[in-house]
């Protein structure tokens, strides 16, 4: 069944890129969003709690060789990986990868603790630190972009998803499909739509049901700003 989607991307922690490379390439997927918070093996084990850094980096190189467009998502956290902010940008610029810094989100266990305030690293702080090492300028971004974009002349681009500093809820068009088949319309709303029943339908019925499901998911969006949720981000997808 052809869904008629104009754009689709995979969000992944990169652990299975090497193993699933053929399937990814054959699927026609052109874009990958890879979550990677550090280039330090020790910090990687501490933050990710599983997996292997070299496996992720090798997978990234393989996907680049295959011609896929890659964005890397990094969540800067004070007292954790804030010393990786500049090395990560240097790594990405040298490979033609756009790095997206994502402000720490008030979700999961952070929703009801002081850790969010303690670890939060703002867009202003990011730009001040990056400015000590790179010359950059703010650039225009598409209307529905979730990121504030910046250009490093002659080297590439980076972005900041500033959900706290500059909320983008009013222009957000994203829908997220989790690994267990649920579609989420908003990260500030734990409600989801179960897509699995559609998989057993005939094409015409499936297309109609899918359109209705996606419309319901869009109605779950809130436009007044990011308020956070107890749902853990890794179960939804970035």
Residues covered by each model-derived region:
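Noncatalytic linker/hinge segments flanking ATPase motor cores
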Residues: 19, 23, 50-56, 72-79, ...
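Intrinsic disorder and flexible/low-complexity segments
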Residues: 228-237
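Proteins with a high burden of low-complexity, intrinsically disordered sequence enriched in S/T/G/P/A and R
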Residues: 1-9, 215-219, 236
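Glycine-centered flexibility motif
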Residues: 51, 59, 66, 108, ...
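Accessory C-terminal segments flanking Radical SAM cores
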Residues: 108-225
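Radical SAM/AdoMet-radical enzyme domain recognition
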Residues: 1-102
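Short, charge-patterned binding micro-sites
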Residues: 105
């Amino acid at each position: 069944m052809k869904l008629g989607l104009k754009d689709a991307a995979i969000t992944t922690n990169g652990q299975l890129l090497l193993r699933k490379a053929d399937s990814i390439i054959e699927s026609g997927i052109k874009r990958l969003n890879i979550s990677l918070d550090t280039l330090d093996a020790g910090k990687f084990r501490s933050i990710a709690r599983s997996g292997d850094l070299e496996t992720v980096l090798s997978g990234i190189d393989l996907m680049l060789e295959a011609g896929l467009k890659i964005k890397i998502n990094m969540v800067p956290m004070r007292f954790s990986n804030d010393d990786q902010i500049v090395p990560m940008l240097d790594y990405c610029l040298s490979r033609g990868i756009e790095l997206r810094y994502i402000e720490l989100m008030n979700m999961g266990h952070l929703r009801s603790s002081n850790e969010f305030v303690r670890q939060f690293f703002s867009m202003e702080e990011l730009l001040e630190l990056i400015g000590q090492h790179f010359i950059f300028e703010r650039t225009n971004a598409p209307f529905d972009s979730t990121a504030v974009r910046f250009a490093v002349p002659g080297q590439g681009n980076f972005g900041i998803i500033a959900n706290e500093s500059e909320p983008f809820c009013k222009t957000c068009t994203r829908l997220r499909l989790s690994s267990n088949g649920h579609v989420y319309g908003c990260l500030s709303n734990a409600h989801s739509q179960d897509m699995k029943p559609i998989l057993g339908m005939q094409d015409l019925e499936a297309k109609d049901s899918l359109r209705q499901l996606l419309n319901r998911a869009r109605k779950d969006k809130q436009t007044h700003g990011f308020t956070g949720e107890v749902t853990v981000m890794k179960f939804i997808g970035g």
